Swiss-Prot record:
This is Prokaryotic ubiquitin-like protein Pup. Disulfide bonds: none annotated. The keyword DNA-binding does not apply. The lineage of its organism: Bacteria, Bacillati, Actinomycetota, Actinomycetes, Bifidobacteriales. It comes from Bifidobacterium animalis subsp. lactis (strain AD011). The gene is pup. Signal peptide: none annotated.
Amino acid sequence: MPSASGHHQIPAETQRHDDDQTQETAQGLSAAAMLAQEQADDLDAILDDIETVLETNAEEYVSSFVQKGGE
């Protein structure tokens, strides 16, 4: 029904349902953002480990791929 201002009023039950869906969506997005951040942190840790190994053992690492004596 139009209100005095000419706008249709939304039934309270529908409004509560929409509010619940909005809250669930926000919680889902928040959980997804947290998971994405955790995955990014894990990836950063792995890349840091690789970088450390390469810095400390770079010569050994490279020599393991270099052919010796024309092999």
